[in-house]
Amino acid sequence: MKSDLFSGRCGMTLTLLLLLFPYTAKAQTANSNHPVTDAEKMTDALRAGPKFITKDATILDWPVKAGGEYRVLRKGTNEWTCLPGVPGYSHDEPGCFDPVFMQWIKDSLAGREPHITTIGIAYMYVGAWVPAKSGKDITSKSDEFHVGPHIMIVSPRENQKELQSFSRDGSNGMPYVAHLPNGTDLYLVLPFRQWDEK
């Protein structure tokens, strides 16, 4: 069963905000490969970024409802935070976030408008499943493709126009931008390895 955090239309919007990928509710099916125990969640979260970050990062578990508390699985000593894949998401997609990106997530989850004054960076070493064209709803498996390990960047709204020159098509492995459904703020995705490369 999905947690209250990710149920319903509101929860779906929050999920989109959290992971920056424009999935539809039709893609939100439980995945039996998702971590369940705390040990599994920690292992999953540690897959999300480079070891020089993950080895000292704080590991959190997602709150069970909107506005809820994140549960600390391991207290870290650097400024990075890693989380396992989102419960109930169609694919397991853990991430590691710098303080700006993490604050952006927390603001979004709490229903606050994110206020960031500098760029925020996130790693997704496991990659993610995204639409063939950024912003297109996924209605079937044939609509989606896997973006390999990548970095994501969010920026303050005053910098948005600088992102508009990037392509919105992420299917060719090149850097691209996308925006949330019903939103205009762009975020930048920088793949650095194809998903099938070892």
Tell where the protein language model's regions lie, with residue ranges.
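Sec/Tat signal peptide C-region and signal peptidase I cleavage site
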Residues: 23-27
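Bacterial N-terminal signal peptides that target proteins for export
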Residues: 2-13
